[in-house]
Amino acid sequence: MKKLCYFINSDWYFDLHWTDRAIAARDAGYEIHIISHFVDDKIAEKFRTLGFVYHNIPLVAQSFNVLIFFRAFSKARKIIQNINPDLLHCITIKPCLIGGFLAKSTHRPVILSFVGLGRVFSAESACLKLLRSFTVMAYKYIASNKCSLFMFEHDKDRAKLADLVGIDYKQTIVIDGAG
């Protein structure tokens, strides 16, 4: 059975916007894994009941703490190595960075879903500008994985990131939003 692994920063967001897609993939024959920061036991139980395998990870969406980020990176690497998914689908900026980097280093197919570009690409503080430059460098590395697809909900976000990173438009797609 093929394995599809979703990687997202929050359990409630996946439950609200992505569960139907995961059910469709399950019904198409995929074993579904979800890596997230699970804080709601009811959501975890719902996923288990649906036949999904969930993996908890210490990823905090709004945190800029580098130690938390690298701890999440290390845990995600171990989880993804153990799952060995046929496709990794990363949703939101931190999972896209972590999962995209791991997919590139293992030549794994990956979808990177951007529901927006977030503060890193819109704020003008010196700290966020520095973080933006590191993020752009990381996405350049990730985009060199020819098995990567950058998925956006808005043409404007695709154009901005593609221009900053130099992503080949053949590696991008714009879809209707998940909401």
For the regions a protein language model found, what residue spans apply to each?
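An amphipathic, basic-hydrophobic alpha-helix
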Residues: P58-L87, L97-F101, S105, S133-Y141
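Active-site proximal beta-strand in glycosyltransferases
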Residues: K3-C5, A103-F121, M151, I173
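A short, histidine- and acid-enriched strand-loop-helix "catalytic/donor-clamping" loop
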Residues: N9-F14, V60-F64, R108-K129, I142
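Donor nucleotide-sugar binding/catalytic pocket of nucleotide-sugar-dependent glycosyltransferases
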Residues: H55, V136-G179
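N-terminal strand-loop element at the rim of the active site
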Residues: Y6-L67, D157, T172
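Short His-centered aromatic/hydrophobic patch
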Residues: C90-C96, F114
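Membrane-proximal helix-turn-helix segments that form the acceptor-binding/catalytic region
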Residues: I23-A28, S74-R77, L130-F150
